């Protein structure tokens, strides 16, 4: 830690944290409900994930500074440079995602978007997974349905792999660089030098409207089946 005076600075809004921790809980619920055959709960959980992901994508363009893609998406070369210098000790004065972390966010959002979208069109045989059927499974051919069902299962394994890499990265930051990435994502603020400006935050009214629109869109799509 520096000799500079440190103050509490808000770096993450409640909306980003809602999406982050909400998806953590919902992934566990989705897995458990699939294993136990709680099909209605599984569909509800997947639709909620889709709602949060759609909202997060919109918030990535219209939301708070640290939530915006243009704030944290840098070139792949910048991400590689960041990883190459990972072992160098440095104070934890970053605001928002790192160059490498930004790409992980993009990968996770893509995987989390594919998962519920394929689930909408998926259907298992009655002897497997309690005969689960997505609300739109009848809108596609049996061949397409079978392909999307396989993709739905395979993509979940990719999500687990990406989540595992994310957890390992968080641990590496803690052990190697002494950077705590968890507490700021829990409470929204971190200790930063007094001279650093706080990032700009988006309108809560806009966020509420975007979240409501995402929920309505998902609900409308599920009623098409």
Give residue ranges: language-model regions.
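Membrane-embedded alpha-helical bundles that constitute the cytochrome b-like, heme-associated redox core
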Residues: 1-225
């Amino acid at each position: 830690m520096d000799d500079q005076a440190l103050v509490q600075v808000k770096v993450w809004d409640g909306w980003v944290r809602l999406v982050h921790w909400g998806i953590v809980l919902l992934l566990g619920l989705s897995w458990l409900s699939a294993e136990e055959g709680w099909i209605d709960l599984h569909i509800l959980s997947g639709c909620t994930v889709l709602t949060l992901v759609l909202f997060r994508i919109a918030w990535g363009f219209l939301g708070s500074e640290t939530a915006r893609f243009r704030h944290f998406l840098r070139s792949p070369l910048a991400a590689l440079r960041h990883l190459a210098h990972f072992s160098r000790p440095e104070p934890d004065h970053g605001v928002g995602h790192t160059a490498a972390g930004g790409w992980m966010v993009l990968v996770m959002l893509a995987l989390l978007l594919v998962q519920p979208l394929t689930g909408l069109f998926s259907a298992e045989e009655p002897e497997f997974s309690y005969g689960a059927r997505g609300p739109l499974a009848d809108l596609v051919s049996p061949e397409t349905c079978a392909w999307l069902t396989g993709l739905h299962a395979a993509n979940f394994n990719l999500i687990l792999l990406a989540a595992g890499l994310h957890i390992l990265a968080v641990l590496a930051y803690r052990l190697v660089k002494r950077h705590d990435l968890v507490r700021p994502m829990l409470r929204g603020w971190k200790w930063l030098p007094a001279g650093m400006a706080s990032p700009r935050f988006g309108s809560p009214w806009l966020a509420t409207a975007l979240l409501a629109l995402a929920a309505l869109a998902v609900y409308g799509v599920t009623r098409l089946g």
